Design a protein with these regions (language model features):
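Extended catalytic core of nucleotide-activated donor transferases of GT-like folds
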Residues: 1-129, 146-156, 283-284, 288-290, ...
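Intrinsically disordered, low-complexity Ser/Thr- and acidic-rich flexible linkers and loops
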Residues: 67-73, 189, 194, 352-364
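Nucleotide-sugar donor-binding catalytic core of glycosyltransferases
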Residues: 1-9, 129-309, 328-334
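Residue-level detector of structured alpha->beta connecting loops
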Residues: 45, 88, 259-260, 299, ...
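Short, hydrophobic beta-strand segments that form beta-sheet elements in well-ordered domains
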Residues: 22-24, 92-95, 114-118, 137, ...
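Short regulatory "switch" loops immediately downstream of catalytic or recognition motifs
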Residues: 55-64, 173-176, 345-354
Length: 410
């Protein structure tokens, strides 16, 4: 996905006259030599590095070297030589996960570093724990498959009535027993602590990982400082991943056990616990382009937010740009740009929580299921919702829009 996003942004920058140097992280040492030659030859030009999720900022060979100190230049945060501080190039890093995932890389960040976050709660986290980092909120975007009319010539996208799939979900699923390996080597007291945090967050899905994590840490350690709190946050990855996959399973289970078929593109759906696994139509792994192609052939695209409470995920924007109606839980940001039943279908995570607590009583999810079944019988209404969503997203939520905002930061 990150490579796909990069290509989309690069298209815009090339279109407005910028030259693009692609750095190959799979051949980092060779690519570094090419980069160094290119940089030395074009030193008078202005360079900006653009990356996602700290790729190229993780100590990769070539870009980071412990036995070399050109010009004797060192990062204020590290004693290793690195190309970014040697060159002084501005590095813009788009972080599409919670910053707690990248604690160690933030501590070793380049001197001329700018971070883009896609959730305003992540911005608050950065301002609190990394106040010296320049941070900007730019919401996630999507890609319109048929923008050039190559996929479907008759219209902007395939009409709802002609789409072969009722419901699609793109993305992977990882069950708890696999995620548990992240903390199994800890002492039992620590395991119990993180399991308790997970239990509380699962029971209160409106809360953020920041809120629940800090609450429990302060209850456990009364005098904990912000610095100590920050050091404890990375292990909350276990909680964050678990809660998102837990609700992903609940959403899919609620639909398939009600007789709806859900087409999945991604790994791990054989682990979903439900009464009617035959209604999960597993297509296996798929890359970003394949996922987009399949979304453009589905009537409804299911989404479960990766615990973004004030941001968006590319999955719902991709759905809107490709003619599928997005069925998703909400966030404060999504509430600002979408209206339920007009250009999107919202469901409530509290409903899924109560569904599980009831022993998976179908009466709990019946209003959502009935709504979906009725809409699947009403192609005109689904088409209207899809068209309304497309009109919202086509001019303001594409990667060109992200690139325009990045250009202002350059």
């Amino acid at each position: 996905s990150l490579e796909f996003f990069s290509v989309e942004i690069a298209k815009y920058f090339e279109k407005i006259g910028h030259k693009i140097f692609w750095y190959n992280l799979f051949l980092s040492e060779n690519s570094f030599e090419e980069l160094l030659d290119y940089y030395n030859f074009h030193k008078k030009d202005e360079f900006v590095a653009l990356t996602f999720n700290f790729e190229g900022l993780e100590g990769e060979a070539g870009l980071y070297q412990s036995d070399k100190a050109l010009d004797g230049l060192h990062n204020e945060h590290t004693s290793r030589w690195n190309f970014w501080d040697y060159s002084g190039i501005k590095v813009i890093n788009i972080v599409v996960d919670h910053p707690l995932y990248y604690h160690k890389y933030l501590a070793d960040r380049p001197h001329n570093y700018v971070q883009i976050d896609i959730d305003r709660i992540h911005i608050d986290y950065m301002k609190r724990f990394y106040p010296d980092v320049r941070t900007y909120f730019i919401p996630s975007a999507g890609t319109e498959v048929n923008k050039d009319k190559r996929a479907y010539k008759e219209d902007v996208y395939m009409p709802v009535k002609d789409r072969p799939m009722d419901i699609i979900f793109t993305g992977n699923y990882t069950p708890k027993h696999i995620l548990r390996k992240r903390i199994d080597n800890m002492e039992q007291d620590y395991i119990d602590f993180y399991e308790n945090v997970l239990e509380v967050l699962t029971a209160h899905p409106h809360m953020t990982i920041d809120e629940v994590g800090e609450k429990h840490l302060r209850e456990e350690f009364l005098d904990i400082t912000d610095s100590q709190l920050l050091d404890c946050m990375p292990t909350m990855m276990y909680v964050d991943l678990n809660v998102r996959f837990h609700y992903r399973q609940l959403a899919i289970r609620a639909l398939v056990d009600a007789g709806l078929k859900v087409h999945t593109y991604g790994e791990g759906y054989n682990y979903i616990e439900c009464q009617h696994p035959e209604n999960i139509i597993q297509h296996g792994s798929a890359n970003s382009q394949q996922c987009l192609d399949k979304i453009s052939q589905a009537k409804i695209s299911l989404n479960v937010m990766p615990w973004f409470k004030d941001g968006a995920h590319d999955r719902e924007i991709n759905s809107c740009l490709n003619g599928a109606v997005s069925l998703t839980d909400s966030s404060r940001y999504l509430d600002e740009i979408f209206t339920d039943d007009e250009n999107i279908l919202f469901y409530d995570l509290n409903m899924l929580r109560d569904y599980e607590a009831s022993g998976y009583n179908p009466e709990v999810t019946e209003p959502m299921v009935r709504r979906i079944k009725e809409l699947l019988q009403d192609n005109d209404r689904l088409q209207q919702i899809a068209d309304n969503a497309y009109m919202i997203c086509r001019d303001t939520h594409c990667w060109d829009n992200v690139a325009e905002e990045l250009a202002d930061i350059l």
